[in-house]
Amino acid sequence: MAWSEYKKNETRENIGPGAMVKNGMGQYGFFCDSDAGIKILGVQPSEFLPVPSDEIVATFVDIEQMIAAGWVID
């Protein structure tokens, strides 16, 4: 799925640790930045709110690479 420029810019402006992100295939994850770059952590179901799992579902060098791979803020 190709995201709109609006959605891509919203991601660039508002992304931060713990933000929920999604890709064009309907997969969700949590944004996590580290010294090694960006990690997208999986989502663990819970009774009230989704929480990050220990599973790393994707890694990126920077936000532009993340967006190019189809991940945007939800």
Model feature map: region roles:
Residues 1-74:
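Terminus-proximal functional modules
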